[in-house]
């Protein structure tokens, strides 16, 4: 990677309002930027960084509209966000105290049974050993929260932890009583959003400038991570049971950062900065970039997460929903816990039965009046005006009273059903295309509908094409729990590696339940989030890495309680090295996009195993100074690296903790890139014994990827009271025979395991040949 000096570094920041005009817009020539400044440059005459930032703006060249300060930052990051003219932006970039200036950008928002699926027990394991995460504070950065929801009841909880420094922002629709001993804090961050959206009233009817959740996403993620126990939870009797968050005794702090128009960097950073000041222990962020992950120094989430990690906060993020293409994972900085999505052993079965007697397995959450048991006429949407079933595009005369086969893609799945209903259709079969494969995602449709896989879709299209009078019916079977189909499996939508920024860091880290997850919902919109949906529900079932992230955030809270002395890196290590990569059938985890075995670029280390993570045996710990050394190893130089460091003295770590290569970062997984067929790559690792036996002896086991030889030295680690931390080195040798790099697959996979007879500490190994090559897998 090229050296990243000051001249090539741009940056991202946000925090406190000084002067703000919601009517300002891009028509005034101003744009929103995030500005990072050197903390140590603040003149002593200013009593606060906020005052200094105001002074900086006042010193800029004049423009028809004055520069407007949005936020000032001082905890997770240092700098401010502001509305600036082009001349003012250029002047700031030349200022000796400014490290970087980058445009404010928008990000996107990417359970009754999952605790049982994860193996939780009330009498043993992680729940009992952490007392359900009692008094750990989880900061949820999302669309806000619906405070009246029973998942946020504080029954049985003690006083608010004395370490909490936050507050509950009140408003016309968010009284002080909205917060309690469960929901201990709530704030809203909208200045960046309002300036970008021109302060219009376009979304005013639905939006609330308070922490109240008008969309549902934030309530869902918060209740998944740390919701209280709620009996008899369901969505129209689907998934009926007792709902509980992963850490049901943890406290929740809600930070509303997402609005109808997106989630803006300036607001995200303001919330992260505030969460650090408020005293959260875990940050859960189901938000990320659309498309490829930005470079670390222009990624506001990566920068804010670095600052949070410096304060000992675990930052758990969604990997994104851009699968199944490779190199789509976002939130991939090594100090972030990156989570992909998987299925659980619960189905909401709704089969499509065609007139020729064939039965196609499907899924649905439809809860209205069922179709008649008799067969109805069946048509393909592509023959009726709109293959993707866009609203208003279907020919009513061709679909009225019939079941319509619609193709997935282009618009929301529930919107397709709405389009069929508005055109007079009786029902819908929604067919996956090749991109989504056999992934089945249940939806609370407004019309009798089911989703089927790509193979079934192809067969039903052929049936329609070849039959003189095609017919079908839909049979709704409700909630089914069992071993068939096997689970977990990786969702087709789950974003994947390799890590396109730093290929030697394996991403995602793990996968967790993210398909058809039941959790709390807002009272503002229906389960489809469509304007025409009049229904209101307490719980909803939705899918995404947005759902898998809070599962892991909750697990991090439990581990934080069970092991209060563990660092964020140690908590990540415990989750990674105890993850599993087989289904409940004993076969390798399947990728639903292809129907083939998944791999470490798709599922990371594998599926989280909470109870094993409680006692991992060994952990790979990483201090902040080692992350600094990593940044230097990938090409960052002073003063540009100050975007992350804030404190110039930390730059010394580039020498005192120098890494031979970025791959030497003490990560709990291995990712190797061979540039040539005979290349040798060496990585060092350091492990700490956290088991009960201080004299444990671990021996190594290696599963080498094809075309690779692996040597681990030493092959035995003998710990003692005096030696609780030991080092080893791994040598990876490419042994490709003839033909060069092009003669082998672009990637292979294996593992390195350390075991003492009680613990198995497993690290995945991913190998690529030809740096920068993109493969399909």
Swiss-Prot record:
The active site is at 142 (charge relay system), 217 (charge relay system), 546 (charge relay system). It is an enzyme of class 3 (hydrolase). GO terms for biological process: leaf senescence; proteolysis; secondary shoot formation. One of its GO terms (cellular component) is secretory vesicle. Residues 1-25 form the signal peptide. Keywords: Autocatalytic cleavage, Glycoprotein, Hydrolase, Protease, Secreted, Serine protease, Signal, Zymogen. Residues 205-218 have a biased composition (Basic and acidic residues). Residues 199-223 are annotated as: Disordered. It is found in: Secreted. GO terms for molecular function: serine-type endopeptidase activity. Its EC number is 3.4.21.-. Residues 115-614 form the Peptidase S8 domain. Residues 376-461 form the PA domain. The keyword DNA damage does not apply. Glycans are attached at residues 198, 232, 395. Residues 26-110 form a propeptide. It holds the Pfam family Peptidase_S8. Residues 32-110 form the Inhibitor I9 domain. Belongs to the peptidase S8 family. This is Subtilisin-like protease SBT1.4. It comes from Arabidopsis thaliana (Mouse-ear cress).
């Amino acid at each position: 990677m090229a050296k990243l000096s000051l001249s090539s570094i741009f940056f991202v920041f946000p925090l406190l309002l000084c002067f703000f005009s919601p009517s300002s817009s891009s028509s005034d020539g101003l744009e929103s930027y995030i500005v990072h400044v050197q903390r140590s440059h603040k003149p002593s005459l200013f009593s606060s960084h906020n005052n200094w930032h105001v002074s900086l703006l006042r010193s800029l060249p004049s423009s028809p509209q004055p520069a407007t300060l949005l936020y000032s930052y001082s905890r997770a990051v240092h700098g401010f966000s502001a509305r600036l003219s082009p001349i003012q932006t250029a002047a700031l970039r030349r200022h000796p105290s400014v490290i970087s200036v980058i445009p404010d950008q928008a990000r996107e928002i990417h359970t009754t049974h999952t605790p049982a699926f994860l193996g939780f027990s009330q009498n043993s394991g992680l729940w009992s050993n952490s007392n359900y995460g009692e008094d750990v504070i989880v900061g949820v950065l999302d669309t806000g929260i619906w405070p009246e929801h029973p998942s946020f009841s504080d029954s049985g909880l003690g006083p608010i932890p004395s370490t909490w420094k936050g507050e509950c922002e009140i408003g016309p629709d968010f009284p002080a009583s909205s917060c309690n001993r469960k929901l201990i804090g709530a704030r809203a961050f909208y200045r960046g959003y309002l300036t970008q959206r021109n302060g219009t009233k376009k979304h005013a009817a639905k939006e609330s400038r308070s922490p109240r959740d008008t969309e549902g996403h934030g309530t869902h993620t918060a209740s998944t991570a740390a919701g209280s126990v709620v009996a008899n939870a369901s969505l129209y009797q689907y998934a009926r049971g007792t709902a509980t968050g992963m850490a049901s005794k943890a406290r929740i702090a809600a930070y509303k950062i997402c609005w109808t128009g997106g989630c803006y960097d300036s607001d995200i950073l303001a919330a992260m900065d505030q969460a650090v000041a408020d005293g959260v222990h875990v940050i859960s962020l189901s938000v990320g970039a659309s498309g490829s992950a930005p470079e670390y120094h222009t990624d506001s989430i990566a920068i804010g997460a670095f600052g949070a990690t410096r304060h000992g906060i675990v930052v758990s993020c969604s990997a994104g929903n851009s699968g199944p293409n490779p190199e789509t994972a976002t939130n991939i900085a090594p100090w972030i816990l990156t989570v992909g999505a998987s299925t659980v052993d619960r189905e909401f079965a709704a089969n499509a039965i065609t007139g020729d007697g064939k039965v196609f397995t499907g899924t649905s959450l439809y809860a209205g009046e069922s179709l008649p048991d008799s067969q109805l006429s069946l048509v393909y949407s592509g023959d009726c005006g709109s293959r993707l079933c866009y609203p208003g595009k279907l020919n009513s005369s061709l679909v009225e009273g019939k079941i319509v086969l619609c193709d997935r893609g282009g618009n929301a799945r529930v919107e397709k059903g709405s389009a069929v209903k508005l055109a007079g259709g009786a029902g819908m079969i929604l067919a996956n295309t090749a991109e989504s494969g056999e992934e089945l995602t249940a939806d609370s449709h407004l019309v009798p509908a089911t989703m089927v896989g790509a193979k079934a879709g192809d067969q039903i299209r052929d049936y329609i094409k070849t039959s003189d009078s095609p017919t079908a019916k839909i049979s709704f079977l409700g909630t089914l729990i069992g071993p068939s189909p096997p689970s977990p499996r990786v969702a087709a939508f789950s974003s994947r590696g390799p890590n396109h920024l730093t290929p030697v860091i394996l991403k995602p880290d793990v996968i967790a339940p993210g398909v058809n997850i039941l959790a709390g919902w807002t009272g503002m919109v229906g389960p489809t989030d469509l304007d025409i949906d009049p229904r209101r529900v307490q719980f909803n079932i939705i899918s995404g890495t947005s759902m898998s992230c809070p599962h892991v955030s909750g697990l991090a809270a439990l581990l934080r309680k069970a092991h209060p002395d563990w660092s964020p890196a140690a908590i990540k290590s415990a989750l990674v090295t105890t993850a599993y990569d087989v289904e409940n059938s004993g076969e390798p985890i399947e990728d639903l996009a292809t129907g083939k075995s998944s791999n470490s670029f798709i599922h990371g280390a594998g599926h989280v195993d909470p109870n094993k993570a409680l006692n991992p045996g060994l952990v790979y710990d990483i201090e902040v100074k080692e992350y600094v050394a990593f940044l230097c190893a990938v090409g960052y130089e002073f003063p540009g690296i100050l975007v992350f460091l804030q404190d110039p003295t930390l730059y010394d770590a580039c020498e005192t903790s120098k890494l031979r290569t970025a791959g030497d970062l003490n990560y709990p997984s291995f990712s190797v890139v061979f540039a040539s067929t005979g290349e040798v790559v060496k990585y060092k690792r350091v492990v700490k014994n956290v088991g009960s036996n201080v004299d444990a002896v671990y021996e190594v086991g290696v599963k080498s990827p094809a075309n690779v030889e692996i040597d681990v030295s030493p092959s035995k680690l003998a710990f003692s009271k005096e030696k609780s931390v030991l080092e080893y080195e791994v040598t990876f040798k490419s042994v490709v025979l003839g033909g060069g790099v092009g003669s082998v697959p672009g990637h292979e996979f294996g593992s390195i395991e350390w075991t003492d007879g009680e613990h198995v500490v497993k690290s995945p190994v991913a190998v690529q040949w030809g740096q920068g090559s993109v493969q399909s897998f």
